[in-house]
UniProtKB/Swiss-Prot annotation:
Domain t-SNARE coiled-coil homology: 200-262
Protein name: Syntaxin-4
Region called Interaction with CENPF, residue ranges: 154-298
GO terms for biological process, alphabetical: cellular response to oxidative stress; cellular response to type II interferon; cornified envelope assembly; exocytic insertion of neurotransmitter receptor to postsynaptic membrane; exocytosis; intracellular protein transport; intracellular transport; long-term synaptic potentiation
Record key words, sorted: Cell membrane, Cell projection, Coiled coil, Hearing, Membrane, Neurotransmitter transport, Phosphoprotein, Transmembrane, Transmembrane helix, Transport
Gene giving rise to this polypeptide: Stx4
Extracellular domain ranges by topology: 296-298
Amino acid sequence: MRDRTHELRQGDNISDDEDEVRVALVVHSGAARLSSPDDEFFQKVQTIRQTMAKLESKVRELEKQQVTILATPLPEESMKQGLQNLREEIKQLGREVRAQLKAIEPQKEEADENYNSVNTRMKKTQHGVLSQQFVELINKCNSMQSEYREKNVERIRRQLKITNAGMVSDEELEQMLDSGQSEVFVSNILKDTQVTRQALNEISARHSEIQQLERSIRELHEIFTFLATEVEMQGEMINRIEKNILSSADYVERGQEHVKIALENQKKARKKKVMIAICVSVTVLILAVIIGITITVG
C-alpha cells in the first residue's frame, strides 16, 4: 500500500464541505480534535494510536531479531522461540487494532442521516486515516517477513549447493519446502545427498522457521485484507482532506503575512496623519501671525 501522504494532487477545487472539515480538523503532534470534540470517540482514537505505537515498536524489534537469527548458523531454541513469541504479540496487537477500528467506524445509517454533519465527516476521516496507517504498517511487516523467508530459503539453497554440488533444483527445493513437515523435508534431502550433520541441522532449523513464517504471513494477510479495500476506497477522500489541511496551513501563513503588511501600512498611515496635522498646524499658525501683523499695521 503506497503512502498517500506525499502524493497530494495539485490544483483541486476545495468544496465548501471540505472547507468545513478543514476548519474543524486541527492536526498537532499526531492528534486530531474537533472544535467541540466527542470525548468518548477521541478517547478511542487515542487508544488506537497507542496500540499502533506498540505494534510499530514490536515490528522494529522483530526486524532486529530476524537479522540476528539470519547471522547465526544454528540459532538457539530460545532465540527462535523469542522470535515466534514476538510474532504472536504482533498478531494479537493487529487483531486489537482491527477490533478498535471497527468500533469507531461510523455506521451506514448514522453516516447517511448526518452526512452533512462536520462531526460525522470528521469521524469518517479519522477512521480512514487510522485504517490507512494500520494497513501500511501490517503490509510493511508482511513484506519484511516475506523477505526474511526468502533469505532463509537462500541459506538452505547455499547449504545444499555446498554439500551436494547443486543437485537439488530450485523447483525441487520449493516442492520440499511445501511438504509442510520437517521430517519429510529432511528425508527427501537424505535420499539423494550426502549432507553433513551440521548442515542438515541448519537446513532443518531453517525449514522449521520458514513454516512458522508462512503461518504468520497468512494470518497477517487476513488482517491486512480486512481493511485494504476500504482504505483504497477512502483514499481519494483522505487525499483531499490532507490537501485541505496543508492548504489551511498555507492560508494561515499567508494571512499572517497580510496582517504584518497591514500593520506596517497602518503605522505608515498614522505617521502620515501626524505629519499632515503638523503641517496644517504650522500653516494655520503662520496665517494667524500674518493676519495679526496685518491688523496691527493697519
